[in-house]
């Protein structure tokens, strides 16, 4: 916020803190479209992926976007905080026959990992929170380089990104891994040829949908880039109240780990 306020000086713009004023609800899963339709949000089927539109709710406006953090068909709804409870009740009533239920962070984290999505300060450290220079990551180093348009006008970091690309100074690469066995490798060290430390797993799980042991890891280039073979992870697994070290083979795996056609189907499927 201080940075935004400083940047606004000299411009005809107002910066306001609205964190407490706006409530967000995520409706995710194969029946999400049908629930919105049954809740009375007419024409919500016209929304394509990343589209958003305003709809009427309880004397106010709710912004609905076809987005989400699960890799499945889903929507996110933003409404004035005072209307959040009535919106919740409206959705729960419309979804009762379809088994709607609230989920917690553990379930959401599993879904986002299967979708290959990354989390700030979990899979990478943001510039705001990084204390050590070697913890910083450029967009290209966390798989987000495609979001940076080098032809765009000036923006913070523009020169540094172009220089790193031109001089091949990118030091890390974020990759998906498939790991042998079924023991999650969260926070495991990644080795090359079982001896040279080359990276760290930031998120990992046994995926019930992909039926694979999956992970996201940050590796030091050229590992994960031009060198992709003979990678191993060091896992410490609890065995009868004692930790046992396991060295498991890992291979580079494309993300997302699962791909659901219904996520991008137009019009959305009616489950």
Identify the function of each model-found stretch.
Residues 1-271:
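Conserved, structured C-terminal
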